[in-house]
């Protein structure tokens, strides 16, 4: 099935809701970190979302796992995905949610550079190069600021979030290279979540001596939100959108996520609002937009 070369109103509305939910997810992770160790929380998220995915496959009468080389690729995607979220959850222990969102969304730049070398027909263009320069300038601006909540360990958290962004980009490239149009969206989703469980659990056992040290309704709600709303519903919706619409046009819309994430971090977590952060945010967002820009623009 060929991809539609435009985003209709339904796609635009869906993308807006998805990016809003993704932005709020960083606040949800901050809440769950108050009572559940971060990597174990990520493991729980993958377990719960995988169970939801298994039931979905059974209901839709889809095969659960492939028996050919696609299974190997599924394992690789799961390992990359697991390493990415280990970095995200650990990084949020040391840095602000607002900064985390910015660094995670370096991923589209990793994809743009990687696609130039590894994917046919997806070359670096002038708008993409301008976007890369603008985005990394924005990252420099953010690093130059020191919010009132700054700690000596914040740099470690920032590095972990940047690593997560690189891993996210690598996962996307791997899927495009080896799995796109060869498996159904539900299988890409299921492989990512299911095969991330072992690596997350192993890392949690090694690094986290205690998994649960506090539990209340807010923490439980946070974990359920991350597992069902984010990991199951929005990821599955995202893969279905990729299956139907132009990927470059879809990707352009993800620059709304850091905006929502920063706003939620400031409004709900009372995180510091700095000049450098507010200067860097639109630069990073515009950079992401330019990386995904086409000569005809974004048709809606």
What feature does the model see in each segment?
Residues 7-11, 34-39, 43, 65-72, ...:
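Juxtamembrane helix-entry segments on the extracytoplasmic side of multipass membrane proteins
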Residues 44, 100-106, 174-197, 227-267:
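Helix-helix packing/entry segments at the starts of transmembrane helices
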Residues 21, 25-26, 54-104, 140-141, ...:
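Specific transmembrane alpha-helical segments of multi-pass solute transporters/efflux pumps
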Residues 53, 75, 106, 113-114, ...:
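Hydrophobic transmembrane alpha-helices of multi-pass small-molecule transport proteins
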Residues 40-51, 80, 89-127, 132, ...:
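Specific alpha-helical transmembrane segments that line the substrate/conduction pathway
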Residues 2-4, 13, 44-49, 54-58, ...:
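C-terminal-most transmembrane helix of multi-pass membrane proteins
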Residues 1-40, 79, 83, 87, ...:
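Glycine-/small-residue-enriched transmembrane alpha-helix faces in small-molecule transporters
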Residues 53, 111-112, 149-208:
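Transmembrane alpha-helical segments that form core, pore/gating elements
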